[in-house]
Amino acid sequence: MNVLIVEDEIMAQKSLTRVLMQNFPDMNIVGSTTSVKSTVSWLNTPGNHADIIFMDVELSDG
């Protein structure tokens, strides 16, 4: 299962990554972004695919 993490606070991003990797070893973290703009760009890049997106609800740009 491919996972994208969208979080603008780097420590929170790292913590979520660590928790997911420890508890769900079959998850493949395919990317992490820090803004709405960078997330849209990531999603529109050919070849990028996420089955699940963990997204901060209070991003600075959206």
What are the residue ranges of the model-derived segments?
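Two-component/phosphorelay signaling modules centered on CheY-like receiver
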Residues: 10-32
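Short, surface-exposed linear patches
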Residues: 26-28, 51-54
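Active-site residues of response regulator receiver
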Residues: 56-58
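The feature encodes the CheY-like receiver
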Residues: 60-62
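Acidic, metal-coordinating helix/loop segments flanking the phosphotransfer/catalytic sites
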Residues: 17, 32-52
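Non-catalytic signal-transmission and effector/linker regions of two-component phosphorelay proteins
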Residues: 1-2
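Conserved acidic carboxylate
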Residues: 7
